[in-house]
Regions:
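Charge-rich, well-structured scaffold segments of protease-associated domains
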Residues: 1-79, 95, 105, 112, ...
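Short gly/ser/thr-rich secondary-structure transition/capping motifs
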Residues: 35, 88-89
Length: 272
């Protein structure tokens, strides 16, 4: 099932560097040598894109000393070229015949980039649709009520210049079309019907609880802080993030649902 995630990005971002499999392929790997690796480092690693992030009981003065010791002599090198922006999305529908026990399906659409003001709303919407909790819309519709899928999930990835929303599930071959219809039915409900005040409040509190728990993983917190500073030149406190989530209205969610869950703009990849 992991392969379908890579190949779905290839379908969505066809012809763009984002579509390239992060593991590469045997031909490219065989062609690697010292010169090509050094050239890659020179083209992609720059001092203006470096952040030192730490979490825990670390003396800040000692951290500065260590940073200066190992990075103080680094030559200043600024990024010269930006990545080509992806702007030629064409929805695709691909069926791949595979000898698998189940059918595997990916569905999705472009979403908001990391700088977009609707990003936080999209995070909440994704959590409602198929996030970590057992009460997500798709988990209830396909797994709990119908028993059609053991694993169904949605994801939202925000890049610097584009974003991707996707849904994945595996199901028995004979249930594939019914499962797809149920997913599209949930999308339609979210496009047409506002969440009630109580529903929205529960969804907001659930997401905030997940964020609070995630801060207990110190490595993830360290990486999140570093990424935030690199992208936004600041690090929001958990309380600030919570205020942004609490400010989301039913109309905000409805608007984002109509932008991202548009069935005519959905791409689909099926292994069957």
């Amino acid at each position: 099932s992991e392969l379908i995630f890579d190949e779905f990005e290839e379908l969505i971002y066809d012809g763009h560097p984002i579509a390239r499999n992060i593991l590469g392929n045997p031909v490219n790997l065989a062609a690697f040598n010292r010169e090509s690796i050094l050239r890659f480092i020179g083209n992609n690693y720059h001092t203006d894109q470096m952040v030192i992030s730490s979490v825990g009981k670390i003396d800040f003065g000692e951290l500065i000393k260590l940073t200066e010791k190992y990075f103080g002599q680094a030559e200043t090198k600024l990024r010269q070229n930006g990545r080509m922006r992806f702007d030629n999305y064409i929805p695709g529908n691909l069926l791949v015949e595979k000898d698998t026990f189940q059918s595997h399906c990916m569905m999705g659409n472009l979403a908001f980039d990391v700088m977009h003001p609707k990003r936080i709303t999209m995070v909440l919407l994704n959590n409602i649709i198929g996030g970590q909790a057992m009460n997500s819309r798709l988990n209830m519709a396909l797994r709990e009520r119908k028993g059609m899928a053991y694993n169904i999930e949605s994801g939202y990835t925000a890049y610097t210049d584009t974003g991707l929303f996707n849904v994945y599930f595996g199901t028995d071959h004979e249930n594939l079309e019914k499962a797809i219809s149920l997913v599209l039915k949930e999308f339609k409900l979210l496009r047409e019907k506002k969440l009630g005040v109580l529903q929205l409040s529960k969804a907001q509190k659930q997401l905030m609880g997940q964020i609070a728990i995630s801060t207990e993983n110190r490595e993830d917190l360290m990486l999140t802080i570093g990424k935030s500073y690199l992208l936004f030149n600041k690090v929001d406190t958990v309380q600030t993030i919570f205020k942004k989530i609490e400010a989301i209205s039913p109309i905000d969610l409805l608007e984002v649902a109509n932008m991202v869950l548009d069935e005519s703009q959905m791409s689909r990849l099926v292994y069957k």
